[in-house]
Swiss-Prot record:
It comes from Caulobacter sp. (strain K31). Substrate binds at residues 69-70, 91, 202. PANTHER family: N-ACETYLGLUTAMATE SYNTHASE, N-ACETYLGLUTAMATE SYNTHASE, MITOCHONDRIAL. Catalyzes the ATP-dependent phosphorylation of N-acetyl-L-glutamate. GO terms for biological process: arginine biosynthetic process via ornithine; L-arginine biosynthetic process. It catalyses: N-acetyl-L-glutamate + ATP = N-acetyl-L-glutamyl 5-phosphate + ADP. It is found in: Cytoplasm. One of its GO terms (cellular component) is cytoplasm. One of its GO terms (molecular function) is ATP binding. Its EC number is 2.7.2.8. The gene is argB. InterPro entries: AceGlu_kinase-like_sf, AcgluKinase_fam, ArgB, Asp/Glu/Uridylate_kinase, Glu/AcGlu_kinase, NAGK-C. Pfam families: AA_kinase. Pathway: Amino-acid biosynthesis; L-arginine biosynthesis; N(2)-acetyl-L-ornithine from L-glutamate: step 2/4. This is Acetylglutamate kinase.
């Protein structure tokens, strides 16, 4: 063994030893992971994510993956010649769009992630299980309504978003059954819900992750994004903030665009029983491991 290889071995051992207190903290705890962004479409990054999810399972953590798929849906709609329209960051979903969204989310993406996890965990028999919120009526949903002011009359008008929904009830029993099984399963959830009348709805993946994390009383919810975390007015990373500070960031306008719904869902999750939510860069290799098993973490932690 060369000196360089030997030093690398000692460094690895040191890292593992330093991680021991954190491994014990998360032993048999549920961690909900919102997996999305452009990194999800990169095969090498997807393989690293799957391997890290398997490692979490083998270290005693109960990971639950909720995935998005906006860019993939947009590409499929473009191929089908269906135009996409967005209101407040939500895709207006008519019948044709809903059919494509469910096919992409519950079919292609969901099964691909579950398969990567199963391949990564093959030697230890860790298996990814792909589900949508329709399975076992895990996610009961209702239609989302939005209003906006008419520029001419300044009157609030209802905007029809089509088959865009929001969770009204979460039944976590099927997930809990998988997590407590003798086989090491990792549930992978597509953000599709169903109404009490049987209507299918497309739901924002951040919203689903927050609702599931609350129902499962998860210790952590990790929101993997394309940025380092939440930034302050000067563009610097905020390492930790309270729910009150997160609200203030929204109200002041410092948080804008896609960060607003992420913060809103993080606030909702914490207020519904999740110990803390972390927004972090999912493009960085092993970001989840650094966040959970090191002193300083890897993103912005939001707690009470």
């Amino acid at each position: 063994m060369t000196d360089v290889a030997e030093e690398a071995g000692w460094a690895t051992a040191k890292t593992l030893a330093e991680a021991l207190p954190y491994i014990q903290i998360y032993d048999r705890e549920t961690v909900v992971i919102k997996y999305g962004g452009h990194a999800m479409g990169q095969e090498q990054v997807a393989k690293l994510f799957a391997a890290d999810a398997v490692l979490l399972k083998l270290l005693g953590v109960h990971p639950v993956v909720v995935h998005g798929g906006g860019p993939q849906i947009s590409r499929m709609l473009d191929k089908a010649g269906v135009k996409s329209t967005f209101v407040d960051g939500l895709r207006v979903t008519d019948e044709a769009t809903m059919e494509v969204a469910e096919m992409v989310l519950s079919g292609a993406i969901n099964k691909e992630i579950a398969n990567w996890i199963t391949l990564a965990g093959a030697e230890a028999d860790v298996r990814g299980v792909g589900l949508s919120g329709k399975d076992a009526r895990m996610i009961t949903a209702e239609k989302v309504t939005r209003t906006r002011k008419d520029p001419g009359s300044n009157i609030e008008q209802v905007v029809d978003l089509g088959f865009v929904g929001e969770p009204t009830k979460i039944d976590p029993h099927i997930i809990q059954a998988l997590l407590t099984s003798e086989t090491d399963y990792i549930p992978v959830i597509a953000p599709i819900g169903v109404s009490t009348e049987g209507q299918t709805f497309n739901i924002n993946a951040d919203t689903v992750a927050g609702a599931l994390a609350g129902a499962l009383k998860a210790k952590r919810m990790l929101m993997l994004t394309d940025i380092a975390g939440v930034l302050d007015a000067d563009g610097n990373l905020i390492r930790a903030m309270t729910v009150a500070e997160a609200r203030a960031l929204i109200e002041s306008g410092v948080a804008s665009g896609g960060m607003i719904p992420k913060l809103e869902n993080a606030i909702h999750a914490v207020e519904n029983g999740v110990e803390a939510v972390v927004i972090l860069d999912g493009r960085r290799p092993h970001a989840m491991l650094v966040e959970l098993f090191s002193e300083h973490g890897a993103g912005t932690l939001i707690s009470k």
